[in-house]
Amino acid sequence: LVGSEMCIRDRYKVLNLFIAGVGTVGGNLLEQIRIQQPKLMRQNGLKLNVVGISNSKKALLCREGINLDNYLEELKENGEESNPEHLCEEIVKMNIFNSVFVDCTASPDVAALYETLMNNNVSVVAANKEAASSSYDNYTKLKETARHRDIKFLFETNVGAGLPIINTMNDLINSGDHILKLEAVLSGTLNYIFNTISADIPFSEAIHMAKEAGYAEPDPRIDLSGKDVIRKLVILAREAGYPVEQADVKRNLFIPEKYFEGSLEDFWKNIKDTDAGFEEKRQLLEAEGKRFRFVAKMENGACEVGLQAVDSHHPFYELEGSNN
């Protein structure tokens, strides 16, 4: 086995991947790896060896690599009962050279594993926003651990999905620039809702449509609260060099606090009460040639999020659908 591993390493650079989460994000990543693997090996001399796949209940681990043609079936039938702590212990015990933990979950329990993994020389790549938007002390500790261990802690997809926003910011800072101000639309869900509202589609119906289209969370109050936007803004501000906490961000809610209280059923029943007010505002904006945008701003470390009216001269005006 050792001889076989050395032979592969001689021919290719091998990255051994542990992938947590097999939902939309993790499933698409695994499919992309499966399709691109021959090309990566042929053109880049890179072998992505998926040695671990886990969901919230089971983990499938194999140091020789997992067949990605039927990994869901394998995970279901042959995966071990597992939880985040058990998964972390098994990864550390496997002690595989050049390994990367890829977090495709949204779980704070999984994010809590990063420090232990990194202290055992496992790099971390996270789609999960929990760690990078957690306390500033935890954020800096993880960054410092990665530097000290000469491994990676990457979270590019935390903001902007596939757009290289964080990497571009890092390049600017490393070349001597200072980022003084940021302004962005960071929620595809909210942008979809405000682009959908019309004389025929009230605010409450637009929220329903966002949920049905798969943009909104099962509990859309998470999106409407701006919490996800706040986390993204905090991450960007920190990467720009400012020691920002989530509690530091000024929130200008466009829905009264009372709608975030009670059950989800209460929310759906009561949110219709806001339709008339939003339609009145929409008509006024339409007459002025303006549109609603939920905007995140950072200036010299001061952060705020809130609803803003923009005219046709503003870069955010033409953002269609769920674009952000």
Give the predicted meaning of each segment.
Residues 147-150, 154-213, 227, 235:
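Rossmann-like NAD(P)H-binding beta-loop-alpha module
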Residues 196-197, 205-317:
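Substrate-binding/catalytic subdomain of NAD(P)-dependent oxidoreductase enzymes
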Residues 107-119, 129-155, 161, 166-169:
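Rossmann-fold NAD(P)-binding glycine/threonine-rich loop
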